[in-house]
Regions:
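Residues within the alpha-helical elements of helix-turn-helix
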Residues: 15, 19, 33, 37
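Conserved segment of winged-helix/HTH DNA-binding domains
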Residues: 51-84, 127
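C-terminal effector-binding regulatory domain of bacterial HTH transcription factors
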Residues: 171-202
Length: 202
């Protein structure tokens, strides 16, 4: 994953082609798309590099995600049903299992699935796709922040609080719980910046 590689590390196109067993054309198109999303930089004479993380882009990403997902939390609390609550409960259990097993990659996936479940409950087609696109830059930091044990534990606590307020049908508290959960990202960003200053660009 791009966020877990050293920033500015060269992406060897031929190595990717060999590993995936595909032609140059789709790889080139994929790299151009990543460049458009600000994730890589392409230099025709020297190669393709992972872009440094731009603080402004990360904060914009977080702002958009918060606006979308706080509305999702309100909607879920208002329209909740047994099926939604059962699905969310399973996601919480899955995350806790991954946490106990110290499976960081799986924790990230289960974190995503919790939010994905809520988005799909509201509008099952485009909402998560839009959210996912909006949070691309933010996700680069999130991958790095899960290396911190305390954050892994807090994610579960925050998800449980979101779940409880949705289950209670309390729209204001559900929205506030989601807002606090997503705002904690600013704390995560500071930690990651302090630990990996060379990954970032102002």
């Amino acid at each position: 994953h791009l966020s877990s590689r050293r920033q500015r590390q060269m992406c060897i196109r031929d190595r990717v082609i060999k590993r995936l067993g595909v032609s140059r054309t789709p790889i080139r198109e994929a790299l151009l798309r990543l460049e458009d999303e600000g994730l890589v930089q392409i230099f025709p004479q020297s190669g393709t590099y992972v872009s440094k993380i731009k603080i402004e882009a990360v904060l914009e990403s977080q702002f958009i995600r918060e606006a979308l997902e706080c509305s999702v939390a309100r909607y879920a609390a208002r329209k909740r049903n047994d099926e939604l609550l059962e699905r969310l409960s399973r996601k919480l259990e899955d995350y806790e299992t991954a946490l106990n097993d110290d499976e960081v990659k799986l924790m990230y996936e289960k974190d995503e699935e919790f939010h994905h479940t809520l988005a799909n409950f509201c509008f099952p087609n485009r909402l998560w796709k839009i959210t996912n696109q909006a949070k691309l830059q933010m996700d680069r930091v999130r991958h790095l922040s899960l290396a911190v044990q305390e954050r892994r534990i807090n994610v579960l606590k925050e998800h449980r609080w979101i779940f409880q307020n949705i289950a209670d049908g309390n729209e204001d508290r559900a929205e506030n719980a989601m807002k606090k959960h997503l705002e904690y990202f600013h704390h995560d960003l500071k930690i990651v910046q302090d630990e990996h200053p060379d990954y970032f660009k102002e």
